[in-house]
């Protein structure tokens, strides 16, 4: 059974913000109701964060907690002490989940996926790039050499792409809405989708892409960014995937990993629907599918 990293402290207080931080608690409640195991992570240490982020940036984050409103100018979120600690905890959760994925074959983080953070700055609600941190930590520990990031958030993983741009051991794949935030960086492979692309546009492209990536790169670990903002009722995006289409998206990734006996760690990424219950349902299904027997992923 897949283990999932979670802390109640993942949820900073961002009143009236478009990012529904309460989704983490709602997803955790759904996982507990399904009998899943949730494990409290330790916060990522400064030493671990320095494998990705510059010391100047980490120092600036600490200073900004003295004037939290400055965070809106760079990250579009308040840079409070609880916010910074939430991001460190979420990075720790991604590290924990990645280690468990290597042991058990699959694991998830009820959080994470902050793919807009660069080595020396944050943006787009993202302060710490936990995807990059987990990869660099596992490489430093000698647990992996090669990794593949499959980023299916509606927005391109620009920070992740930039961090690994010159590293042939880390394959970055992003399939996203082309005409939307952010300014694009160059991933190993980008598929930019037209506005209003739906299930029938999206899923055939993904079915073709994922096996090519895994067979060509042969990663030791697959890092899956299972963003929910491709949902047809998302407030910040114009992709039109149904809930069933998003579940099939997840199955395509998991099926390909299982067929090749590749460990996969899942992070949640974005999701800004009209109803927070919808994003909680989508995210929890992405994590619950990690435990589906192979024969059911059809």
Residue ranges and their predicted role:
Residues 1-298:
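HDAC/HDAC-like amidohydrolase catalytic core signature
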């Amino acid at each position: 059974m897949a283990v999932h990293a979670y802390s109640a402290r993942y949820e900073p207080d961002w009143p009236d913000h478009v990012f529904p931080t309460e989704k983490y608690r709602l997803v955790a409640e759904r996982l507990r109701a399904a009998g899943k195991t949730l494990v409290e992570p330790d916060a990522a240490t400064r030493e671990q964060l320095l494998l990705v982020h510059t010391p100047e940036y980490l120092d600036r984050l600490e200073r900004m907690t003295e004037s939290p409103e400055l965070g809106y100018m760079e990250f579009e979120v308040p840079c409070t002490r609880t916010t910074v600690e939430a991001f460190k905890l979420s990075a720790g959760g991604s590290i924990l989940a990645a280690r468990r994925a290597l042991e058990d074959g699959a694991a998830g983080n009820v959080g994470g996926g902050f793919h807009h953070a660069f080595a020396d700055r944050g943006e787009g609600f993202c302060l710490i790039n936990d995807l990059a941190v987990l990869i660099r930590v596992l490489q430093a520990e000698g647990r992996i050499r090669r990794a593949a990031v499959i980023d299916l958030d509606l927005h391109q993983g620009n920070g992740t792409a930039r961090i690994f741009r010159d590293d042939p051991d880390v394959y970055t794949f992003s399939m996203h809405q082309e005409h939307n935030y952010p300014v694009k960086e160059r991933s190993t492979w980008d598929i930019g989708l037209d506005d209003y692309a739906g299930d029938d546009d999206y899923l055939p492209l993904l079915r073709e892409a994922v096996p090519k990536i895994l067979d060509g790169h042969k990663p030791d670990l697959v890092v899956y960014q299972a963003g929910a903002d491709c949902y047809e009722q998302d407030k910040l995006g114009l992709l039109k995937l149904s809930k069933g289409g998003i579940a099939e998206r997840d199955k395509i990734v998991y099926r390909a990993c299982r067929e090749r006996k590749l460990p996969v760690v899942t992070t949640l990424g974005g999701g800004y629907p009209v109803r927070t219950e919808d994003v909680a349902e989508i995210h929890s299904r992405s994590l619950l599918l990690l435990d589906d027997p192979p024969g059911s992923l059809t």
